[in-house]
Amino acid sequence: MLRVCNEKDCHDIWVINREEMGYDVDFEIAQNHIINVLNDDSQRIFVYEVDGRVVGYIHAATYNLLYSDPMKTILGLAVLKKYRRNGIGGCLLLMVEDWASDSGAEAVQLSTGKDRDVAPIFYKAWGYDLRKEQYSFIKHFTDNYNA
């Protein structure tokens, strides 16, 4: 079942992030981040539930640029390995595309790591074009950043 995320989904999303994405973050921290997103109208989390358990999710946000109309950006998409190749990722992607279209967004954009070799194939199959390859820089202000 495809639906909007709620606070009860925090644990399942935390497990997916740990097992499938490699993000080892304390549950309480992850839960607080998810709740903050749920309370932010510029962001959405959609989940796919099977037998009462969230097996996949997508997180997207409004992406405002000074030189383009607003877009939505996908910040995360993950499906438990056992449930992959069953159309769940595509259903989640369509939820974001519908939200983007309904809100008047110009496009949906995303970035994916070069180490995620299946992701480019998936996104191209869903009509996404590779726009450019780029470097990603980050400067941390605390020592407890795990992603």
Residue ranges and their predicted role:
Residues 93, 100-112:
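Conserved GNAT acetyl-CoA-binding A-motif
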Residues 1-8, 143-147:
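Conserved N-terminal entry element of GNAT/NAT acetyltransferase domains
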Residues 76-79, 85-98, 125:
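Conserved acetyl-CoA-binding loop-helix of GNAT-fold acetyltransferases
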Residues 124-133:
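Conserved acetyl-CoA-binding loop of GNAT-fold acetyltransferases
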Residues 109-119, 138, 142:
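Conserved beta-strand-loop-alpha-helix junction that forms the acyl-donor binding cleft
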Residues 5, 77-79, 112, 128:
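Hydrophobic adenine-recognition pocket in adenosine-nucleotide-binding enzymes
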Residues 4-8, 15-70, 75, 94:
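Acetyl-CoA-dependent GNAT
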Residues 70-81, 135:
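Conserved acetyl-CoA binding element of GNAT-fold acetyltransferases
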